[in-house]
């Protein structure tokens, strides 16, 4: 994040609400989080301290007048500067006791949320720790009214909170006292402990004096104090964020540096009751849960929060494990059909991976309820995949197209594709428009899908030698057969794994001779015929010829079109009709011989078109 975002604000109903944009940021953070929150009276410089922890001059808004800038709770996430693989989450809260708001209940909620969400709580105040400062920290005495460790109200006491509450840091701003007691120097922590010292007695006055101190001592056994001198002169306070380090008091900078180092070194990763590590995703869910509790008027219960979080995380862990399993099985599915042993082996491997993914995210699944749910769902999916593997392995009927490409040497193309697959049939006919179709019997036995089949043709070369697999999800593959001498051709299609013959036919030599005669008869023979045919159908050539590139290559190879025109029509971005117009213009201007050669090329490349045009003349 390059700047803070609002995490908790006030909704239209006047209640606190979580901002969806901030939740989305937290949902993306899978790392453990260290959460540092700052609370304190408004206009005491909380945001300045947070910006220093972020290593920035600006970020969290600073106010230069009596109106506070921060409202609700703002969040800034960044990589932890000293703990690898950890995210630092800074929470800046709105100032307490804002005279404009005048809502003590809201202040208590803000303070309670800061305590519940943070692993380190920074309390920021001005001056010294005296009775006034303690009175301003009244919210700590109210924590026990709003937060409970267990649902059993009688079981809670102040000491129970200490295990789950954050490290407490009291930052005293504009501190001017000399740290001495009875002539002896005091450390900042010793000063804090002196200020928290209890008075003996049971009078109401003594009890009122001791109450906030006793709560701090019991709620926050881990506590620290930092005393900051004034950062600059009074007239420059309004532009504090724009001042360079050279313009700030050196002692203030030294304390700030110590404070930041302490926070980075001592702040622990946030944990739930029971020791579960909090990630950004979990922090987002906790925030939503706590704010919803406030809206309902209920009391925060740490144990209930853990139970609710366990439910959320374990359901998500189940889904995560299931996705790991499904991704792997879907990949395996592309190779169906497979032996059942292979499918079962992959099921076991992926089940183990899915369980590991589940265990990495789940917590407190003590009865194994969610793990059993994951195993049950994987079992259902396995049954479905096993059934699909069996279905894919079923036999299905196919169609066959056979073409003669040329007679000397004899070259045949043999295509297989599903029965009634019009798209595949059209594709094959388009590819073979210059070939001659051969009549043949349709296969009367079904083929096994995705299983290799080999075509046996005695006395001929067949490619691919390893065979082809019959598939329903790709364009039809084909065998290429080459035979030097034209005689009877026997074909036998064999399923490779069990050597079963699924189709056989014989094509007699006379059929090939007849096909060649048909091809020869269809050709335009005399120069006069070809010249007249060109002149009659020039417009049709421009509009209907499709193999433009192949025709241009042959025309250029026979020097019918010159190099400059060939480069122009093959390298520029023009339409097929524009190219054919240029070709026809060039052929037309070159005379009868060029027209004859052009028609010869068309008889090779556009046989169907020429036959159609000849039929239209009759």
Curated annotation (Swiss-Prot):
Keyword Cytoplasm in record: yes
Keywords of this entry: Cytoplasm, GTP-binding, Hydrolase, Immunity, Inflammasome, Inflammatory response, Innate immunity, Nucleotide-binding
Residues holding GTP: 40-47, 62-64, 92-96
KW Nucleotide-binding (keyword) present: yes
CDD domains per record: CARD_ASC_NALP1, GBP
EC number(s) recorded for this UniProt protein: 3.6.5.-
Domain (CARD) ranges: 526-617
Entry-linked SUPFAM superfamilies: DEATH domain (SSF47986), Interferon-induced guanylate-binding protein 1 (GBP1), C-terminal domain (SSF48340), P-loop containing nucleoside triphosphate hydrolases (SSF52540)
The organism's place on the tree of life at top rank: Eukaryota
InterPro entries registered for this protein in UniProt: CARD (IPR001315), CARD8/ASC/NALP1_CARD (IPR033516), DEATH-like_dom_sf (IPR011029), G_GB1_RHD3_dom (IPR030386), Guanylate-bd/ATL_C (IPR003191), Guanylate-bd_C_sf (IPR036543), Guanylate-bd_N (IPR015894), P-loop_NTPase (IPR027417)
Assembly and binders: Interacts with pycard/asc.
Family note: Belongs to the TRAFAC class dynamin-like GTPase superfamily. GB1/RHD3 GTPase family. GB1 subfamily.
Full protein name: Guanylate-binding protein 4
């Amino acid at each position: 994040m390059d700047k803070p975002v609002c995490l908790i604000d006030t909704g239209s109903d006047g209640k606190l609400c979580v901002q969806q944009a901030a939740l989305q940021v937290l949902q993306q953070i899978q790392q453990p989080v260290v959460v540092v929150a700052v609370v304190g009276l408004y206009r005491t410089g909380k945001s300045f301290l947070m910006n220093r922890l972020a290593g920035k001059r600006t970020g969290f808004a600073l106010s230069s007048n009596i109106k506070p800038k921060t409202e609700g709770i703002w969040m800034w996430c960044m990589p932890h500067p000293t703990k690898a693989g950890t995210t630092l989450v800074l929470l800046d809260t709105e100032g307490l006791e804002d005279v404009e708001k005048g809502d003590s209940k809201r202040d208590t909620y803000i303070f309670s949320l800061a305590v519940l969400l943070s692993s380190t709580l920074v309390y920021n105040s001005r001056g010294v720790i005296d009775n006034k400062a303690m009175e301003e920290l009244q919210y700590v005495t109210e924590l026990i009214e709003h937060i409970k460790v267990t649902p059993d109200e009688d079981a809670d006491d102040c000491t129970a909170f200490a295990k789950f509450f954050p490290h407490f840091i009291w930052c005293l701003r504009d501190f001017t006292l000399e740290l001495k007691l009875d002539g002896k120097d005091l450390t900042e922590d010793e000063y804090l402990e002196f200020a928290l010292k209890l008075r003996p007695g049971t009078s109401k006055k003594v009890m009122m004096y001791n109450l906030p101190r006793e709560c701090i001592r019991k709620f926050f056994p881990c506590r620290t104090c930092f005393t900051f001198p004034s950062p600059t002169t009074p007239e420059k306070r309004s532009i504090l964020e724009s001042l360079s380090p050279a313009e700030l008091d050196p002692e203030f900078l030294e304390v700030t540096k110590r404070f930041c180092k302490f926070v980075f070194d001592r702040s622990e990763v946030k944990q739930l009751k029971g020791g579960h590590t909090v990630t950004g995703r979990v922090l987002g869910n906790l925030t939503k849960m706590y704010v919803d509790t406030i809206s309902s008027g209920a009391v925060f219960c740490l144990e209930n929060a853990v139970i609710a979080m366990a439910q959320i995380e374990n359901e998500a862990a189940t889904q995560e494990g299931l996705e790991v399993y499904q991704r792997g099985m879907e990949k395996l599915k592309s190779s169906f059909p497979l032996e059942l042993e292979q499918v079962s082996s992959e099921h076991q491997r992926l089940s183990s991976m899915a369980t590991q993914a589940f265990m990495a995210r789940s917590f407190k699944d003590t009865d194994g309820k969610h793990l059993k749910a994951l195993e049950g769902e994987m079992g259902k999916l396995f049954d479905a995949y096993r059934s699909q593997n069996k279905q894919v392995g079923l036999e299905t009927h196919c169609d066959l197209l056979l073409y003669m490409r040329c007679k000397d040497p004899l070259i045949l193309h043999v295509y297989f594709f599903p029965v009634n697959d019009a798209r595949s049939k059209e594709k094959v006919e388009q590819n073979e428009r210059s070939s001659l179709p051969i009549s043949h019997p349709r296969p009367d036995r079904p083929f096994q899908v995705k299983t290799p089949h080999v075509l046996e043709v005695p006395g001929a070369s067949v490619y691919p030698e390893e065979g082809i697999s019959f598939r329903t999800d790709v364009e039809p593959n084909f065998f290429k057969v080459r035979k030097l001498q034209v005689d009877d051709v026997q074909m036998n299609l064999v399923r490779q794994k069990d050597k079963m013959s699924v189709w056989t036919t014989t094509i007699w030599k006379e059929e090939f001779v007849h096909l060649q005669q048909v091809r020869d008869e269809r050709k335009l023979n005399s120069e006069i015929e070809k010249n007249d045919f060109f002149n009659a159908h020039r417009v049709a050539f421009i509009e209907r010829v499709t193999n433009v590139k192949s025709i241009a290559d042959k025309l250029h190879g026979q020097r019918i079109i010159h190099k400059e025109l060939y480069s122009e029509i093959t390298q520029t971005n023009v339409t097929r009709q524009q190219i054919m117009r240029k070709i026809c213009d060039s052929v037309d201007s070159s005379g009868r011989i060029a027209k004859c050669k052009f028609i010869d090329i068309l008889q090779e490349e556009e046989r169907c078109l020429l036959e159609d045009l000849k039929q239209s003349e009759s």
